[in-house]
Amino acid sequence: MELGEFQDVIRRTYRTRDAARGVDGTFRWMVEEVGELARALRLDDDANREHEVGDVLAWLASVASIAGVDLDQAASRYAHGCPRCGAIPCACPPR
């Protein structure tokens, strides 16, 4: 599934709820899901990692949609490697 297709499915599925919650409320839900992903990673919970990554992606798609951001366009910044140095793998000095 392409990012734009995924974003469209999420938009059609949750548009009404996301609109009622607004950008701030939807962003807070996404942050909660990031916390759940952090817990699954910290506990090395193989069974739950994929589930939580999917939840984070879905909430990111919701935030992007109600903020007017196209995920395909946003991801295209990385289409040719590192957006700073242009290399694959990144050749930037560590930060």
Go through each PLM region and give its residues.
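Flexible "arm" and connector segments at domain edges
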Residues: 1-53, 57-95
